[in-house]
Amino acid sequence: MSQQDKKLTGVFGHPVSDRENSMTAGPRGPLLMQDIYFLEQMSQFDREVIPERRMHAKGSGAFGTFTVTKDITKYTNAKIFSEIGKQTEMFARFSTVAGERGAADAESDIRGFALKFYTEEGNWDLVGNNTPVFFFRDPKLFVSLNRAVKRDPRTNMRDAQNNWDFWTGLPEALHQVTILMSDRGIPKDLRHMHGFGSHTYSMYNDSGERVWVKLHFRTQQGIENLTDEEAAEIIATGRDSSQRDLFEAIEKGDYPKWTMYIQVMTEEQAKNHKDNPFDLTKVWYHDEYPLIEVGEFELNRNPDNYFMDVEQVAFASTNIIPGLDFSPDKMLQGRLFSYGDAQRYRLGVNHWQIPVNQPKGVGIENICPFSRDGQMRVVDNNQGGGTHYYPNNHGKFDSQPEYKKPPFPTDGYGYEYNQRQDDDNYFEQPGKLFRLQSEGAKERILQIQQMQWKA
């Protein structure tokens, strides 16, 4: 049936006899409560807005394909990387961080760079940014960052002095602040920026050998940025500049691509590394740990419905596949709890059943039978009458010991260790970054800092 031939019904399929005129007591009388279509429409409308993401609320996304171009099987046995030429479906969501859903795309802000790969071993979520570092290295400060960069409780306005008051209390923030205030602080759009996993992760191979890795995604479109003046001009004419650019590029077949690289550090190198290799405020120098090409991803299909896919997509650092693992990075460890918890609040405990979040490479029928019930359990018959406990005598859903990860190295006693006593090398890397800038770029960094502090 064509769109023109469709007839209007309510959500339960009842024919709607009149779309324009409410049922009233007489032609000028009050409404009758038995106008079921009016009641249905208004009650649906009153509830259709779901909670906004606490960070990364304004986003754009697209489906695509990841392709392996180089062999890294000596580092990892993850099947997504098992052979050159292998392709995996994926979804990407890019975002600003501090702004709300209606924020302008061209604001000075970090950009979120979140990727979901639908592998045959489950979904792999890489929740990154367009910068390789962050403002701090302990997750206890994350709530305060949210408060500082969002709206002031008294004025309900965003306040640059709150930002600077917070940042200047954290000497380790200088690296991220330098990047944010540099020419790369405002990407021209989402296609012309790099992405980073930022955290240190680990990979392990068939022999159980573990290496630490950082992940990089370099745009094949080249880096393009905006000055403050250019950004202000764009915002004055349209707040959705990056979203429009990405959508229109994909619609006309100009598919954006990024090349994936890893940096690799052995466990022995990590023990002897000058700084804490798991410190999110620092990078690994490329001359010491060179970039190793892995593959590329291409975004080639726009969602048919923004809410269905871009708004409801749920990323969590806990979504990781065999062959990949975590690290002692404290910020990563904090995100292992926070992201999944936030998605369960925002979308419900069964948000994994939303199509964009389903583990397409595994099959919905093979999902854990011990997670049952909950609001909106709809797509898998709630596992029917199958066994929902373990151990059982039916031989169903046994563990898979072949997927056990190699032992995770730790040291020390549980204690609130003073991070500043462990590492106070705050200025070496931001200093090197600043000195790499052109004289004009250095001047712009200082001008932006002065302007924002006076704001």
From Swiss-Prot:
TM spans (from-to): none
Signal peptide: none
Lineage: Bacteria, Bacillati, Bacillota, Bacilli, Bacillales
Segments for region (Disordered): 1-25
A Pfam family it matches: Catalase
Gene Ontology cellular-component annotations: cytoplasm
GO molecular function: catalase activity; heme binding
Similarity remark: Belongs to the catalase family.
Protein name: Catalase-like protein
Gene3D superfamilies reported in the protein's UniProt record: Catalase core domain
Superkingdom, taxonomy of origin: Bacteria
Biological process, per Gene Ontology: hydrogen peroxide catabolic process; response to hydrogen peroxide
Organism of derivation: Staphylococcus aureus
Family annotation (PROSITE patterns): CATALASE_1, CATALASE_2, CATALASE_3
Protein task: Catalytically inactive.
